[in-house]
Structure formats: C-alpha cells, structure tokens
C-alpha cells in the first residue's frame, strides 16, 4: 500500500501599530471629552516558528512564538476613602507599559483505526508585564487627584508632579491560564453514530494585578508584586450524535454535557493585598455542569 507523508516548516513575523483602547484615549472617558496627551499607538512585534507533520494515521503541529507589546495602554479603577471617610471610586489611565508573551504549542490527531480518533494539545506560555507605567489618578468627576485621599489638583502649571509611577517588571499577566492541555477521543462504532469524550486542564492562571490606592504615592514608584496564582483545575466533557433518515428527511440528534463531574473551580480573580485566596476580590467561578440537546433536520 502506498503511504503518503508531508513535512512542512514555517516562519512568520509581523508588526502592528494600533490605536490605544477607548478608555485610554481620554483623560476620563466616563465624564469628559478631554483627550489624553500621553496616549500613544500600541506597537506589537510578533515572531512565530512552526513545524508540521502529516501522514495517513498521524498529524501534528508544533509552534513557538514570541510577542512584544510596547506602549501598552492600561486602565485601572478602584476605591479610596476620602477626607470625610466616605468610599469613592478612582480611575487611572496609564501609558508606557510593556508586555512580553512567549511560549510553545503542540497539537496532534491520531487515527489508529477507521472508527477511532485521538486528539490532543499542550500549550505552555510565559506572559509577563514589564516596564514602567505612568498615569494620573482621577475622581468620578474627571478631576486629577493630588493624593489618594481625593484632594483635587487646582494648579495645573506643573501637573506632571501628580503622576503615579507603576513598576511592573516580571509581573505575570492575569486572566488566562498559561499552561493548558487537552486530550480527546472520538468513536464511531456504527454508521451514523459518534461518541466523544474530552479532558481539559488549566494551570498557572494568575489573578489580575491590583493597585492599592492607599499605598500609592507620587513620591516613589508603586511596585506591583507577583499576583495570586489561582489553583489549577480540569474538566471532562462528553458528547454524542446520531444521524439517521426519517422518511425523506435527514436528521441528526446530538447532545453534550460540559463539566461532567461538576468540578468547582475559579476562572478569574483580582489580586488582593496579601496575594492569596483570602484577600482576592472579584472572584469568578467557572460554569458547573451544563448540557445541551439538539435536533437538526435537513430537507
């Protein structure tokens, strides 16, 4: 029997210059049309090296990437206690930060039998903030705050002295797992019937960094520390589908159950003062067990 095999490699690079996020374009996008003079286009430099293999029974891809994001616009918000002891909200537009993303990705599909397919993936990344971000702390009226107690700047002749400096060297990027893996298997034991099971794994997911207004001053840089590392988790999903003829109608009945074992896990959070689960805020739990059932009719 003739066997076919294909090997390919590739290298990609790119550069993107894009406008900053809307909130960073204005001094305070919620209350003023005054433009932020420090807003700059964000620059993204990206490099990717890949290798692929194809054969009758097995296919795989491996990619390595490096992305450098310069002049990253950041927008943060929080609360502070004013001179009267009341809780108020602040916002901060920051410019000058940098993010470095690098990692490796692998995926494969194996077909040992006509009725069986195995697929999987693995991804490891190292995503970090770097550099120094600067910005004004604003109150809800769009006024520049002279300090974290809410006092307002009245003399704008030397307003730059009220900028906050945020040191972000080697701070892990939060909001997305930097290590992920998956393994799935699909069976087709008879004509029209499909059975599928998937295992998904997520690790090294960090809480989003937090700026504590009560500790920040304009006299010295505010150093962002390593955020809380959210516990890793895994889920199992199953699905099935059956295609059949209903008279002259071609029908497919299918369904799936996500998070089959109702695994409880934290998907996202904001870092707290002690960088642990006890002080984390805005904790968002992932979905529990969910299911769907579908009927598709082709006339």
Show the residue positions of the predicted features.
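Short, small-residue-biased leader/transition segments that mark boundaries at the very start
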Residues: 2-7
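Transmembrane beta-strands of outer-membrane beta-barrel pores
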Residues: 13-19, 55-57, 66-70, 102, ...
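Gram-negative outer-membrane beta-barrel transporters
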Residues: 66-68, 87-212, 296-298
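Solvent-exposed loop segments that connect transmembrane elements
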Residues: 23-35, 74-92, 130-169, 208-226, ...
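Outer-membrane beta-barrel signature, preferentially recognizing the C-terminal barrel domain
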Residues: 15-69, 80-111, 173-179, 229-231, ...
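Conserved C-terminal beta-signal and adjacent last beta-strands/turns
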Residues: 8, 42-47, 117, 170-299
């Amino acid at each position: 029997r003739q066997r076919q095999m294909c090997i390919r490699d590739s290298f990609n690079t790119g550069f993107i210059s894009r406008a900053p996020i809307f909130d960073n374009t204005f001094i305070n996008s919620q209350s003023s049309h005054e433009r932020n003079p420090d807003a700059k286009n964000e620059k993204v430099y990206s490099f990717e090296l890949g290798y692929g293999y194809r054969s009758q029974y097995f296919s795989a891809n491996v990619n390595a990437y490096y992305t450098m994001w310069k002049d990253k616009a950041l927008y943060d918000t929080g609360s502070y206690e004013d001179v009267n002891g009341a809780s108020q909200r602040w916002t901060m537009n920051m410019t000058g930060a940098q993010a470095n993303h690098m990692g490796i990705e692998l995926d494969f599909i194996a077909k040992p039998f006509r009725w069986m397919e195995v697929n999987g993936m693995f991804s490891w990344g190292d995503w970090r903030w770097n550099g120094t971000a600067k910005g004004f702390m604003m109150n809800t009226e769009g006024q520049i705050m002279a300090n974290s107690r809410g006092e307002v700047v009245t003399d704008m002749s030397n307003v730059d002295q009220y900028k906050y400096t945020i040191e972000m060297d080697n701070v892990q990027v939060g909001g997305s797992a930097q290590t992920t893996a998956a393994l799935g298997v699909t069976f087709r034991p008879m004509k029209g019937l499909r059975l599928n099971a998937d295992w998904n794994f997520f690790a090294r997911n960090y809480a989003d960094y937090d700026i504590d207004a009560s500790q920040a001053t304009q006299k010295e840089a505010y150093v962002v520390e390593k955020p809380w590392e959210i516990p890793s988790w895994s889920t199992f999903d199953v699905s099935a589908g059956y295609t059949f003829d209903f008279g002259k109608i071609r029908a497919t009945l299918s369904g799936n159950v996500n998070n089959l074992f109702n695994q409880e896990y934290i998907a996202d959070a904001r870092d707290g003062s002690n960088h642990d689960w006890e002080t984390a805020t805005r904790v968002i739990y992932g979905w529990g067990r969910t299911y769907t059932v579908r009927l598709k009719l082709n006339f």
